[in-house]
A protein has these predicted regions:
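PRPP-associated nucleotide enzymes
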Residues: 1-297
Length: 297
C-alpha cells in the first residue's frame, strides 16, 4: 500500500475504528452525524482525504437502515474527496436474505451489494458474514475475515474442563471445527431443524451427538445472536443432557428482545461476543483480524 492510510470512524463503530487506527498507526478521522427530526442522517467528514487510502469502519446493526445509509454516504463522499476507499462493514446486515427463499421475496443482499458497488468503494471487508453467497453480490474486491480464532483464544485462557465446541446446527459445523482447532479440542454440531415459515427451532435431546457433551464444559459458537432462539434452545438441551457448564460465543451480539437474559435464564454461564456490535458482552476485539486483511490489500 503506497498511499497514506487513514481510518474514518463511522458513527456506529467509533471505538472499533479507534482500535484499527492504533494497530495500523494510521490517522483517525472523525465523522460527524446529525439526525434530523424526520430520521434522515447527515454526514460530515472532518479531514483531508485527497490521495489517501481511507478505511471506513461502520457496522450495520440496528437501526440497520440508518447505519447502512450512513455507510454509503461516507463511502460516496470519501471517494469524491479523492480517497481510495475500503468499506469495512464488520457486521453486514441483510446477508441472511441472499436468495429468494419463498416466491416473491426480495433478494435484499443483491441490492445492498449494488449500492456499495456504485458508491465508490474499491474494497469491502466484512467479519464472519452470515452467508458467503452475500459476498458474490459485490463486484468490487470483497473479503470476509474470521473472528473465530480471536474468540477461541479468549476461551482458551479460561481453563475450561474438557472443553467441547458446539455448533447449534450443521450449517455452522466448520465454524465449530475452526474454534476447536485453536482451543485444542473436538467439536460437534447439533441436529437442529427450523420451520421456514414459523421460525420454530427443534433439537432432539436424544440425538447421539449429544453424548460427547456429558460432563464437559461446552462452548456454543455461532456467527450471530439476534433474538437468540436457536442458542436458547441449544443451551436448554445441553443443560438437560448433563454438561458441566455452557458458554456461548458469537461474533455479532445483536441480542434483541431481551435475548441475553433469556440465554442466561436457559442456563448459560457466560455469553461472549465481539465489538462488531457494541454490547455488554463485547469482550473480544476484532480490530486485529481487520488490520491483518488491510495489510494484504
Amino acid at each position: 500500500m503506497n498511499k497514506k492510510i487513514c481510518v474514518l470512524a463511522g458513527p456506529a463503530s467509533k471505538d472499533l475504528a479507534k482500535n484499527v487506527s492504533k494497530i495500523l498507526n494510521a490517522e483517525l478521522i472523525d465523522v460527524e452525524l446529525k439526525i434530523f427530526p424526520d430520521g434522515e442522517s447527515k454526514i460530515k467528514i472532518d479531514g483531508d482525504l485527497d490521495g489517501k487510502f481511507a478505511i471506513i469502519v461502520q457496522s450495520t446493526y440496528p437501526p440497520v437502515d440508518a447505519h447502512l445509509m450512513q455507510s454509503l454516504f461516507m463511502v460516496s463522499k470519501a471517494k469524491k474527496m479523492g480517497a481510495s476507499v475500503c468499506a469495512t462493514i464488520p457486521y453486514l446486515a441483510y446477508a441472511r436474505q441472499d436468495k429468494e427463499f419463498l416466491k416473491g421475496e426480495a433478494v435484499s443482499m443483491e441490492l445492498v451489494g449494488s449500492l456499495f458497488n456504485s458508491s465508490g468503494a474499491k474494497y469491502v471487508i466484512t467479519v464472519d458474514v452470515h452467508s458467503q453467497m452475500a459476498l458474490s453480490y459485490f463486484k468490487v474486491q470483497a473479503y470476509n475475515v474470521s473472528a473465530v480464532p480471536l474468540l477461541a483464544n479468549y476461551f482458551k485462557s479460561q481453563k475450561l474442563f474438557q472443553p467441547l465446541a458446539v455448533s447449534p446446527d450443521a450449517g455452522g459445523s466448520a465454524r465449530a471445527k475452526e474454534f476447536a482447532k485453536v482451543v485444542g479440542t473436538s467439536s460437534i454440531a447439533l441436529p437442529k431443524v427450523r420451520d421456514k415459515k414459523t421460525g420454530e427451532v427443534k433439537i432432539d435431546p436424544d440425538a447421539p451427538e449429544l453424548k460427547a457433551a456429558i460432563g464437559r464444559d461446552v462452548i456454543l459458537i455461532d456467527d450471530m445472536i439476534s433474538t437468540g432462539g436457536s442458542i436458547i434452545k441449544a443451551t436448554e438441551v445441553l443443560v438437560k443432557v448433563g454438561c458441566k457448564k455452557v458458554f456461548v460465543a458469537c461474533t455479532h451480539p445483536l441480542l434483541l428482545n431481551g435475548a441475553l437474559d433469556k440465554i442466561m435464564d436457559a442456563g448459560a454461564s457466560e455469553v461472549v461476543g465481539t465489538n462488531t456490535v457494541p454490547s455488554q458482552v463485547s469482550k473480544v476485539d476484532v480490530a486485529p483480524a481487520i488490520c491483518d486483511q488491510v495489510s494484504k490489500l
